[in-house]
Curated annotation (Swiss-Prot):
It comes from Cupriavidus necator (strain ATCC 17699 / DSM 428 / KCTC 22496 / NCIMB 10442 / H16 / Stanier 337) (Ralstonia eutropha). The record marks K336 as: Transition state stabilizer. Binds 1 Mg(2+) ion per subunit. Substrate binds at N126, T176, K180, R297, H329, S381. This is Ribulose bisphosphate carboxylase large chain, chromosomal.
């Protein structure tokens, strides 16, 4: 739906007082060829009835850059032709006549270097409540290399983390301590020890365990690190537990992080809800203190899940990689949380690629050169168990943390047995894959064979079998049918 020529008003009329259509003010240019240094954004827009989609696209470009509702004479005091964002392409969304994909280019000089807070204030700060548009969703972005290089990125990255842990050739295993609220510090530490002793690499706090009346944060840190040290000594492996330092102020978060470091922790955790400035600040602290930063995407579903309005998680994942987290929850596709398999694999691409290629089936609209930025370790967590090990490895490969919370803590023979079941299932599946077997199709047979020699795995398969959460995902690809993982 490219316009054959510019519809911008003549220069003199452009600055006449009054209200003018956005496309006439210069926010639409169907002939524009994006520059390598432009920042590109793709919006899914649903214009109000009777609103021209090109005008709606121009409005998005205007309201996310320099425009207001009327002509202002102070535009003449700026290089406004450069600073105006330009909507340059509008495509209909397949099988949805009310929606359109709107491509917008922004000049790099509109953004502060190394600041996700500044980026988001422009791109999503105002346009989502604009009346001429029923709904808008930010689907994807492309950052120019010059912009990417202003960010330090992950403080540790996948390669360095594996070297510190001395664990290669397989996914990492973890579990979230359950119940996530209510345990005393001592009992919490007990759960951590049992999980790590049974074969897990990590245990972790959940998103809402901070410092409550039933367990002060300092008690939790002390008991957890005692458990980590004892499990490491018992197994001869490097172990860890994600200590959640999320708090009400940055000062308190730094205090908790410093205490975690003083106890010998290799990793701390924060929640997405702390905000972008806090995330970048904690990443800087981790870089200075040789710590791994785990991010729980708490709250993301409030704006990522609905397909017609909000922000796609692939965009959030790109922002988080720039912001500098080492781990982020990215979905399982087979668990209890929202996730179309192809779409979720697109999130993993964003985390682990050196160069992400456009792939519409995975929701990736742009090529992205990550300019040697370190890679993020994706985390699959939420409603998964040992019986799904073949599906998880087939979907996500080795560079992923597989976290079995209920699938460890809920084991009928106890926590340590639950951890052992997951470790044996993982080792058996990796061995079978390395031998050239088709683990996706032969996976259940491989697990049954391994369970003949492992009572905890046999009990896990008997308890959960092939339990899955078969609900239709809401955020699916517009260019490919929802894939089956069975």
């Amino acid at each position: 739906m490219n316009a054959p020529e510019s519809v911008q008003a003549k220069p003199r009329k452009r600055y006449d007082a009054g209200v003018m259509k956005y496309k006439e003010m210069g926010y639409w240019d169907g002939d524009y060829e994006p520059k390598d240094t432009d920042l590109l954004a793709l919006f899914r827009i649903t214009p109000q009835d009777g609103v021209d989609p090109v005008e709606a696209a121009a409005a998005v470009a205007g309201e996310s850059s320099t425009a207001t509702w009327t002509v202002v004479w102070t535009d003449r005091l700026t290089a406004c032709d450069m600073y105006r964002a330009k909507a340059y392409r509008v495509d209909p969304v397949p099988n949805n006549p009310e929606q359109f994909f709107c491509y917008v280019a922004y000049d790099l000089s509109l953004f502060e270097e190394g600041s996700i807070a500044n980026l988001t204030a422009s791109i999503i700060g105002n346009v989502f409540s604009f009346k001429p548009i029923k709904a808008a969703r930010l689907e994807d972005m492309r950052f120019p290399v010059a912009y990417v290089k202003t960010f330090a990125g992950p403080s540790t990255g996948i390669i360095v983390e594996r070297e510190r842990l001395d664990k290669f050739g397989r996914p990492l295993l973890g579990a979230t301590t359950k119940p996530k609220l209510g345990l005393s510090g001592r009992n919490y530490g007990r759960v951590v020890y049992e999980g790590l002793k049974g074969g897990l690499d990590f245990m972790k706090d959940d998103e809402n365990i901070n410092s409550q009346p039933f367990m002060h944060w300092r008690d939790r840190f002390l008991f957890v690190m005692d458990a980590v040290n004892k499990a490491s000594a018992a197994t001869g492996e490097v172990k860890g537990s994600y200590l959640n330092v999320t708090a009400g102020t940055m000062e308190e978060m730094y205090r908790r992080a410093e205490f975690a470091k003083s106890l010998g922790s290799v990793i701390i955790m924060i929640d997405l809800i702390v905000g972008w400035t806090c995330i970048q600040s904690m990443s800087n602290w981790c870089r200075q203190n040789d710590m791994i930063l785990h991010l729980h995407r708490a709250g993301h579903g409030t704006y990522t899940r609905q397909k017609n309005h909000g922000v796609s998680f692939r965009v959030i994942a790109k922002w988080l990689r720039l912001a500098g987290v080492d781990h982020m929850h990215t979905g399982t596709a087979v668990g209890k949380l929202e996730g179309d398999p192809l779409t979720v694999q697109g999130y993993y691409n964003v985390c682990r690629d050196a160069y992400t290629h456009a792939d519409l089936s995975r929701g990736l609209f742009f090529d992205q050169d990550w300019a040697s930025l370190r890679k993020v370790m994706p985390v699959a967590s939420g409603g998964i168990h040992a019986g799904q090990m073949h599906q998880l490895i087939s979907l996500f490969g080795d560079d992923v943390v597989l976290q079995f919370g209920g699938g460890t803590i809920g084991h009928p023979q106890g926590i340590q047995a639950g951890a052992t079941a997951n470790r044996v299932a993982l080792e058996a599946m990796v061995l079978a894959r390395n031998e050239g077997r088709d683990i996706l199709n032969e996976g259940p047979e491989i697990l049954r064979d391994a369970a003949r020699w492992c009572g905890p795995l046999r009990a896990a398969l008997d308890t959960w079998g092939d339990i899955s959460f078969n609900y239709t995902p809401t955020d699916t690809s517009d260019f490919a049918p929802t894939a089956s993982v069975a």
